[in-house]
């Protein structure tokens, strides 16, 4: 019934077509019995690598298990195809910048690129057997997703959780957009710590160490610790900034670290978050000398020129009033920098170039005391890798800081798998210092459903789109009752996380029970049962999703969250195109097949990074081959699609294998209910190799072939083989869907092994404690016999004239049925239970002593 060799390419093609046609994975909207999975939508950002398969397989193991358990599984796939990652891919593909081609043309280019990338993802997911219901596919830039994302924003704004404000934010000078705190990564760079001479009005020299001397023109104060005896006499005096000659106050603040640098710190607007804190706490002026391109712009020292408002629709003198930021107006002009002769030297330079130039000027003027080479951590944009600047601009924010306690309660209410990952989220939430900036100065994203009024008497008023009219594009559409001349459309787009943070709601087609699309299914699938994702986006995707569900419905978005680790390259680093360490999935799939790739993915524990290992693929291939060969052997003793009956299983060792299998079903079911797929596979695999193949198939062979005269024992063997293999296939099915389907079809049924309610139930088996203990004793004795033969270079098949066994306890002696199988598998003419033995070929394990009488001549 089974071919000589398993041809994975033919089988995979066959069942991919069959599964799609039969809709075996389709959700049937069965209320009350649905298991909903919030699937991570892959980002459309570049070429695929083996890591893309890694965690998606983990989710599929659970989806297939739950389906076989009897659940109506809601298993969608989405594509996160809007936002900065997609824009960067398009810019790289066409070797252009978004602003060079214009909004409309660039958006067209984005749609072209994402369509091709989506097809590549689809082919990959199908080729590895991911059991999505493709009719539930969604896209974060689709009309429905944009409508829901805009609904989410409107709901948050109306509830007071979304707001717009001019304030210092993290700015990416490469992608020219604001970014959120969660999109930062710390990188270590080589730099220099420069000790610079300032002066006081009394002409007293003071020394300040800094890694950013290019910010000297932005210096607005000098700080010392109030208890630093070296500098207490300076508090309240005026410092003269090196090179620029600007006069700034010397202020005491306990956030200064006495043991860092010289103990004196210059506050520049803005070098880091501490500068923001000091500027706002002490009411200092702002001197913004870096523009949105990452260049020195001394003309913009007031922070009010057009370049600082570029891309936001806001400029000085526009009809939209400036919001109250609590920032004191400038008292200095930029004249000191001009007068000091550095204006022409550094104006227009990139930050790094300006730093080098300033150091040269300081050296020439004798104001650089010391320059020490150091390595230090710099905050960079996660996407572009560029060092970030802090610039004051108008942005949209979602409140996070005032709801930290409530969000932490939600985090603790959710079940985390593994539990250790919950702590990672708690640490992140507790350490938050910024509200979530959700606006981006880009093109390809969800537009804010907002206009700003120019109508007389309501200048600057925010006009929200009506929910029933969503989705809208404020650049093309008008608010009800307003003319084009009376409004300014908001030109920003939402952070891509602002949309992907509502993936449970995108699947439900509603933001909450009161706000959704007409055809919503919110009451059927929200909250979801499971969110699966990798650990590096806990602080983004997991956090933002919990936050939004809390705001929209005071609910968890899902009951369980399952966290995968990374698939690391051979160099133990995360796979990435830029590092040149990616492994193409298509090559691996062509070499080993989908089941082996899935086996590799299943051999990683939740939350643990796994180094790519070719050896695991080889082990997986060996397992697939063994499963095929074992099935071929069993097929010799059964009719195709024969009925299975446990009632005719009568022999001790047959009951032993059933009892072992009973415990495996119990363990693997519990493992998978806790999302521990790795532990489940390990238990199945151990049973298959050790109990079934190494021991049971060997001991039952002769009885199955009918060598024995006992027809009842022969029938017991055949039924046991067919029965056990059937359950083995169903246990392996979530992990190895192709080979199990083929064997199941050929031997057992035309129905799919993956059908609902086809997971093995331990009630299908008989647990016989006596037979299990008897069988375990049997295996111990068999292993001792094998050891003696191996140690003495005697063939396993070599005839034993007499097998003598001493049991430490009389009750451990085998019964007639088991002893008969032992005699067959050991090829022994006689088995004798003895009180003592002095044979030459002997070994023992504490429970049994075994000796052999063999003619080796």
Protein language model annotation of sequence segments:
Residues 31-39, 61, 94-98, 122-129, ...:
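Active-site-adjacent bridging/hinge elements
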Residues 195, 340, 432-498, 502, ...:
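Feature 926 captures the class I aminoacyl-tRNA synthetase adenylation module centered on the KMSKS loop
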Residues 51-63, 71, 79-80, 145-148, ...:
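Structured ligand/cofactor/substrate-binding pocket environments in proteins
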Residues 64-72, 93-103, 123, 127-132, ...:
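Secondary-structure transition/capping motifs at alpha-helix termini
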């Amino acid at each position: 019934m089974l071919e000589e060799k398993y041809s994975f390419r033919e089988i995979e093609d066959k069942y991919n077509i069959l599964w799609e046609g039969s809709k075996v994975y389709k959700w049937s909207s069965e209320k009350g019995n649905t298991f909903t999975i919030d699937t991570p939508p892959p980002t459309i950002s570049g070429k695929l690598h083996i890591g893309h398969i890694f965690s998606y397989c983990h989710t599929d193991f659970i989806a297939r298990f739950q389906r076989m358990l009897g659940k109506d599984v809601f298993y969608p796939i989405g594509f996160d195809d809007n936002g900065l990652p997609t824009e960067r891919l398009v810019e790289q593909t066409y070797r252009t910048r978004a602003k060079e081609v214009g909004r409309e043309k660039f958006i067209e280019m984005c749609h072209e690129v994402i369509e091709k990338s989506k097809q590549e993802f689809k082919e990959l997911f199908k080729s590895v057997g991911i059991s999505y219901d493709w009719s539930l596919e969604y896209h974060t830039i689709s009309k429905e997703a944009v409508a829901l994302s805009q609904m989410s924003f409107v709901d948050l704004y109306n509830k007071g959780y979304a707001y717009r404000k001019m304030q210092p934010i993290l700015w990416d000078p490469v992608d020219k957009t604001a970014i959120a705190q969660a999109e930062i990564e710390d990188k270590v760079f080589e730099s220099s710590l420069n000790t610079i001479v300032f002066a006081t009005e009394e002409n007293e020299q003071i020394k300040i160490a800094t890694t950013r001397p290019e910010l000297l023109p932005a210096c607005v104060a000098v700080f010392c610790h109030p208890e630093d005896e070296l500098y207490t006499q300076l508090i309240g005096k005026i410092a003269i900034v090196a090179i620029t000659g600007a006069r700034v106050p010397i202020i005491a603040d306990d956030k200064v670290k006495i043991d860092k640098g010289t103990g004196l710190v210059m506050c520049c607007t803005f070098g880091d978050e501490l500068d923001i804190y000091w500027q706002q706490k002490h009411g200092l002026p702002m001197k913004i000398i870096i523009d949105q391109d990452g260049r020195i712009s001394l003309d913009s020292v007031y922070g009010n020129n057009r370049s600082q408002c570029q891309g936001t629709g806001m400029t000085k003198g526009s009809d939209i009033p400036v919001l109250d930021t609590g920032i004191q107006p400038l008292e200095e002009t930029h004249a000191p920098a001009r007068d000091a002769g550095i204006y022409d030297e550094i104006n227009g330079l990139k930050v790094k170039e300006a730093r080098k130039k300033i150091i040269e000027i300081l050296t020439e003027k004798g104001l650089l005391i010391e320059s020490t080479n150091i390595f230090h951590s710099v905050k960079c944009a996660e996407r572009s890798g560029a060092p970030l600047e802090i610039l004051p601009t108008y942005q949209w924010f979602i409140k996070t800081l005032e709801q930290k306690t409530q969000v932490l309660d939600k985090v603790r209410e959710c079940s985390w798998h593994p539990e250790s990952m919950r702590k990672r989220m708690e640490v992140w939430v507790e350490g938050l210092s910024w509200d979530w900036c959700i606006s981006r100065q880009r093109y390809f994203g969800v537009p804010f459903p907002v206009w700003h009024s120019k109508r007389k008497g309501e200048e600057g008023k925010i006009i929200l789109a009506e929910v029933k009219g969503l989705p809208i594009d404020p650049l093309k559409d008008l608010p009800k009752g307003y003319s084009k001349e009376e409004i300014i459309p908001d030109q920003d787009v939402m952070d891509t996380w602002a949309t992907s943070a509502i993936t449970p709601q995108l699947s439900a087609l509603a933001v909450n029970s009161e706000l959704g699309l007409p055809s919503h299914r919110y009451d059927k699938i929200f909250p979801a049962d499971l969110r699966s994702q990798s650990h590096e986006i806990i602080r983004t995707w997991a956090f933002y999703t919990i936050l939004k569900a809390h705001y929209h419905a005071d609910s968890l978005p899902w009951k369980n969250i399952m966290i995968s680790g990374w698939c690391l390259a051979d160099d133990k680093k995360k796979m990435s195109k830029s590092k040149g360490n990616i492994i193409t999935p298509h090559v691996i799939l062509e070499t080993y097949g989908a089941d082996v790739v899935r086996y590799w993915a299943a051999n990683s524990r939740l939350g643990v990074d796994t180094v790519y290992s070719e050896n695991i693929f080889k082990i997986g291939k060996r397992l697939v081959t063994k499963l095929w060969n074992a099935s071929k052997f069993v097929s010799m003793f059964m009719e195709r699609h024969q009925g299975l009956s446990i009632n005719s299983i009568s022999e001790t060792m047959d009951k032993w294998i059933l009892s072992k299998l009973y415990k495996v079903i119990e363990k693997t079911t519990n493992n998978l209910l806790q999302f521990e797929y790795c532990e489940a596979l390990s238990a199945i695999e151990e049973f298959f190799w050790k109990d079934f193949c190494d021991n049971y198939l060997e001991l039952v062979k002769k009885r199955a072939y009918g060598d024995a005269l006992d027809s009842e024992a022969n029938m017991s063997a055949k039924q046991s083989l067919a029965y056990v293999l059937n359950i083995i296939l169903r246990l392996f099915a979530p992990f190895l869907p192709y080979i199990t389907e083929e064997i199941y079809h050929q031997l057992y049924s035309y129905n799919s092994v993956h059908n609902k309610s086809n997971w093995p139930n331990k009630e299908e088996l008989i647990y016989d404690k006596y037979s299990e203990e008897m069988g375990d004793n049997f295996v111990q004795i068999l292993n001792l016999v094998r050891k003696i033969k191996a140690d003495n270079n005697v063939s396993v098949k070599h005839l034993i004239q007499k097998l003598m066994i001493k049991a430490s306890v009389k009750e451990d002696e085998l019964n007639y049925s088991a002893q008969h199988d032992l005699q067959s598998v050991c090829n022994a003419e006689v088995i004798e239970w003895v009180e003592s033995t002095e044979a030459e070929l002997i070994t023992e394990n504490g429970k049994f002593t075994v000796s052999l009488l063999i003619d080796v001549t």
